């Protein structure tokens, strides 16, 4: 709800502030009070997991048929177990790549294409030409092959620019699957419905695992060893995630910023959910906690510039962040002093958590926050001036205020040896994959949020920029920007097929940032309005465990 408030400046001047009141935290102290897994129970689960992992390794050794190897790899990935079997999957992919596929049907060709593309193999989409007639149309004999169509549908979303056959495949398979949906038996109908809502490649891993395990359980051809391992692994990781979100919630409560800055969104659990979408594996625990804290403070910053501060107050805060020293607090408006000092202290705490040879990472993150604050200030100026920039000019600033340059940098700070000084130099160089991810984030946010924000006298979003530049309605502008979102996905796919100077897991983190946007901002801003779908998803991942 929008409201107005007044603040005295000196003895005379009054400031009329526009501020948006957000709903309070959905979760409060829930994760401090509730913890489900006892130490002895966890110890038994870990022992059983190790036994099951040995059995699955034996499956890799005993499976020689290429199709069965593909199904095994696919199942393990869909169930979130691939981080246990990286060596085995790497060897399996080489076999899959070298296999003779001459006699493969739609299901097999599509599955192979998707698995290999997901892992950076630049496989040609020409493999699908044999499923077209001499007029370039997909063969009518494919129409009833639901499993083949679903695999082609999911494979086609790994397409890059100029791969028109994959664009055609999406249109064809989507139409066919929608028409078949009412005739399909379970669990295939649920699986098709799940991926029609959001394609496999664009889904966040943890939420996919939580929704796919019940589907896999109903499959006739399921492997019960893999199923049990998936459930136990999910529960063990959930226990770890509960510990982390408890720790972060305690930190957030001690910070108490949303008690003094009541105009800011209180969304620390949702921030943690966001980062679990980026990396969920146990080896990233330190990184998750650091990044969740960093993004929570970025959210407060966003609301300060966006919802409450005057232009002069924004300027003073920006200058203080530029200086990044405790003495600069004297220049910050009174109501922001606590925020400023706690921002600096949190980053000092980050530095203290790092090993001596890792401390060089913090200045890179500090610089990204400085760049972010300057961009926030530029948007604040546009708002005061009622300036509507052209789309290209807008994106030069708003791809930064999307926050993903800073979040990407933060997500690398707590990593182990994979993140090097060259990694942080690479982020600072604004690589194409990170630009595409940031623009994707900005456009999805604006498409979803622009109407609500314009109702409260917000500065122009990319939607308004497009409307002004092209003389269109908001509806048409959103449709055109959605086309740009699809183009950004193709940019991301293309960059994943090119050699880079950073390790593949670090590229995957950037992809996962875009997947998080698909989850959180598709159709609705569920971060701001977190008592809707977001609440259900948080519960699915952090509260509801599997019965074994």
UniProtKB/Swiss-Prot annotation:
One Pfam family in the UniProt entry: Terpene_synth
SUPFAM superfamilies: Terpenoid cyclases/Protein prenyltransferases, Terpenoid synthases
Induction description: Up-regulated in leaves and rhizomes following treatment with methyl jasmonate (meJA).
GO BP annotations, alphabetical order: diterpenoid biosynthetic process
Ligand binding (Mg(2+) 2): 302, 306
Sorted UniProt keywords: Lyase, Magnesium, Metal-binding
Single GO MF descriptor: magnesium ion binding
CDD domains hit by this protein: Terpene_cyclase_plant_C1
Reactions catalysed, as given in the entry: (2E,6E)-farnesyl diphosphate = alpha-humulene + diphosphate
Gene3D superfamilies: Farnesyl Diphosphate Synthase, Terpene synthase, N-terminal domain
Signal peptide: none
Motif DDXXD motif: chain residues: 302-306
This enzyme's EC code(s): 4.2.3.104
Tissue expression from the record: Mostly expressed in rhizomes.
Binding site for Mg(2+) 1: 302, 306
Binding residue positions for Mg(2+) 3: 453
Annotated function: Catalyzes the formation of alpha-humulene in the first step of zerumbone biosynthesis, a highly promising multi-anticancer agent. Also mediates formation of beta-caryophyllene at a much lower level.
Family from the record: Belongs to the terpene synthase family.
Protein name per Swiss-Prot or TrEMBL: Alpha-humulene synthase
Organism expressing this protein natively: Zingiber zerumbet (Shampoo ginger)
């Amino acid at each position: 709800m929008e409201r107005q408030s007044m603040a005295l400046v000196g003895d005379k001047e009054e400031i009329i502030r526009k501020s948006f009141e957000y709903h309070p935290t959905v979760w409060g102290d829930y994760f401090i009070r509730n913890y489900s897994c006892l130490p002895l129970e966890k110890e038994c689960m870990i022992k059983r997991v190790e036994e099951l992992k040995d059995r699955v390794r034996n499956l890799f050794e005993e499976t020689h048929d290429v199709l069965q190897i593909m199904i095994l790899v696919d199942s393990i990935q869909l169930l979130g177990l691939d981080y246990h079997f990286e060596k085995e999957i790497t060897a399996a992919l080489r076999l899959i790549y070298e296999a003779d596929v001459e006699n493969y049907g739609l299901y097999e060709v599509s599955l192979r294409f998707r698995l290999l593309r997901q892992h950076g193999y630049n496989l040609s989409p020409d493999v699908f030409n044999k499923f077209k007639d001499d007029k370039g149309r997909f063969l009518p004999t494919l129409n009833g092959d639901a499993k083949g169509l679903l695999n082609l549908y999911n494979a086609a979303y790994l397409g890059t620019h100029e791969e028109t056959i994959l664009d055609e495949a999406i249109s064809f398979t989507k139409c066919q699957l929608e028409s078949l949906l009412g005739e399909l038996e379970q669990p295939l109908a649920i699986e098709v419905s799940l991926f029609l809502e959001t394609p496999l490649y664009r889904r966040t891993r943890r939420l996919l695992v939580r929704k796919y395990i019940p589907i896999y359980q109903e499959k006739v051809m399921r492997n019960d060893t893999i199923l049990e391992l998936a459930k136990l692994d999910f529960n063990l990781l959930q226990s770890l995630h509960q510990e982390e979100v408890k720790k972060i919630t305690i930190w957030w409560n001690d910070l108490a910023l949303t008690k003094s800055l009541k105009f800011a969104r209180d969304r620390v659990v949702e921030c943690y959910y966001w980062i679990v979408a980026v990396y969920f594996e146990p080896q990233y625990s330190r990184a998750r906690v650091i990044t969740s804290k960093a993004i929570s403070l970025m959210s407060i910053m966003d609301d300060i510039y966006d919802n409450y501060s005057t232009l002069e107050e924004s300027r003073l805060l920006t200058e203080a962040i530029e200086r990044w020293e405790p003495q600069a607090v004297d220049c910050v408006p009174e109501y922001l002093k606590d925020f400023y000092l706690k921002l600096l202290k949190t980053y000092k705490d980050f530095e203290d958590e790092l090993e001596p040879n890792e401390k060089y990472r913090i200045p890179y993150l500090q610089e990204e926050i400085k760049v972010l604050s300057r961009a926030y200030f530029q948007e604040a100026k546009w708002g005061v001036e009622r300036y509507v920039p052209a789309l290209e000019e807008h994106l030069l600033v708003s791809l930064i205020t999307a926050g993903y340059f800073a979040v990407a940098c933060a997500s690398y700070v707590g990593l182990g040896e994979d993140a090097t000084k060259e990694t942080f130099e690479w982020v600072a160089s604004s690589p194409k994959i990170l630009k595409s991810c940031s623009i994707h984030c900005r456009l999805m946010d604006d498409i979803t949020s622009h109407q609500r924000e314009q109702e409260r006298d917000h500065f122009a979003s990319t939607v308004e920029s497009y409307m002004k530049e092209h003389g269109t309605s908001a509806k048409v502008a959103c449709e055109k920007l959605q086309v740009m979102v699809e183009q950004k996905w193709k940019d991301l796919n293309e960059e994943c097929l090119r050699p880079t100077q950073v390790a593949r897991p670090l590229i995957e983190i950037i992809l996962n940032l875009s997947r998080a946007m698909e989850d959180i901002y598709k159709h609705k801003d569920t971060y701001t309005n977190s008592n809707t779908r977001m609440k259900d998803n948080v519960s699915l991942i952090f509260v509801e465990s599997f019965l074994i």
